[in-house]
Amino acid sequence: MDIKNKIIVVTGAGAGIGRALAICFAKQGAKRVICSDIDAIKSKEIADLIDGVSIEADVSKEADLINLIAQSEAEIGSIDLFCSNAGILHQAGLDALDQDWQRAWETNVMSHIWVARHLVPRMIARGGGYLLQTASAAGLLNQIGSAPYGVSKHAAIGFAEWLAFTYGDQGIKLSVLCPQAVQTDMIAGMDGHAASLDGILSPHVVAQACLQGLKDERFLILPHPEVLTYLRNKASDYDRWIGGMRKLNRANDTSNTPKGK
């Protein structure tokens, strides 16, 4: 995909990867970047910086996403690329409350579903469009220390796969961004060793990898290339992979498994 002269929406644009993506898209000549965030002040700040448009939205609410799509297309024009980037990480295992699971599910999974539900038919009607969904390497592998995050990111990738093969013949293109650790507020509470096994990338580096992935129209965008090796190892010997993850879990002392007396 050529970013030049495209109308692009980025959720979670107030900080981290979303902010970096918005800046990169503007520098690449996007016609207009709509910066959306749950924090209206942050989304306006980045929009003002890049001469974009700010629209407040909480991606865990379908009504907000309906409004984001409708307002963007009514005021700016047809959306060429929608980046479903906003996500949350809650460090918990069996102790996670139902509301923790629900919030992770709505933000990390349903947000992608709601965007597709209300935008894909519009895109098909005009000949096609592009969706970029930020998932995580945790959706391909898993997440030590956070059951809601690992599970929800697996579901997000599963939905992205379904979209890609169901609507690919109707002009819908799709990429899934799956980084490991990125220097954002999201990893502030993570164990340092767990976060830095393959290096903590800056949001700018991730955004650059994303631009290349969009240019190549790759389904999986992996800023940490090691993830592909890990995924192949997992597929080739699941039991060995589980053993390796248990070893990492012990090393990081983040096990959520209840211990017997």
Task: Give the location of each predicted region.
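Residue(s) in the substrate-gating loop at a strand-loop-helix junction
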Residues: 136
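Conserved glycine-rich cofactor-binding loop
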Residues: 14-15
